[in-house]
Curated annotation (Swiss-Prot):
Keywords: Bacterial flagellum, Bacterial flagellum biogenesis, Bacterial flagellum protein export, Cell membrane, Membrane, Protein transport, Transmembrane, Transmembrane helix, Transport. It is a multi-pass membrane protein. The chain crosses the membrane at residues 4-24, 44-64, 84-104, 186-206, 218-238. It is found in: Cell membrane; Bacterial flagellum basal body. GO terms for cellular component: bacterial-type flagellum basal body; plasma membrane. The lineage of its organism: Bacteria, Pseudomonadati, Pseudomonadota, Alphaproteobacteria, Hyphomicrobiales. This is Flagellar biosynthetic protein FliP.
Amino acid sequence: MIRFLVTIAVLLALPGLANAQQFPSDLFNTQIDGSVAAWIIRTFGLLTVLSVAPGILIMVTSFPRFVIAFSILRSGMGLASTPSNMILLSMAMFMTFYVMSPTFDKAWTDGVQPLLQNQINEQQAVQRIAEPFRTFMNANTRDKDLKLFVDIARERGQVVMTDNVVDYRVLVPAFMLSEIRRGFEIGFLIILPFLVIDLIVATITMAMGMMMLPPTSISLPFKILFFVLIDGWNLLVGSLVRSFN
């Protein structure tokens, strides 16, 4: 996890550091020249990027698919707050670490380590660190979603490819759209058996004339029992992890 955090921190910090100049000694003089103003702007931009680091992490990893699947599971079982949001987010985060570990390791080996050893400069490090994430997103993005954003960008006159490589402005939203879609596809398969249990219980209670008794309160124990008997967590997590390319 420490390697992951260092990799993300370097990836976020390098774009600002790559163009940063040395801190000027006359920063507090009454007359501020252009270099000082540029340094202030770059520092402000770097702090802004670091403040949105969690959002950047969500955009380029497997986190959305896990969160959507776990949330739909909880809703399908009829549990309002069990497991809690903290537990679901923690599970999604550590499952993301597991799925993304080859990507993090490659980014660390190819980009961070050579930079720390002064073998490459900051610009080369940014490219090497970002390349494993590009490979992961390319492998898990639907062609239809990618084509959608490519067509929209071309309609606006934007350059979407450089040296046969798709621009991140196109790849990242296409990847997020694909992740959300797959999350809902898996969620549908999760919620379907619970819906069947609800329908069976509702039919039985209506046949018995128990109109005032909510069917969901009766079906909840059966849904929990069903999920435990089929080892649902094992099946769900295994299916989610194997669904990534």
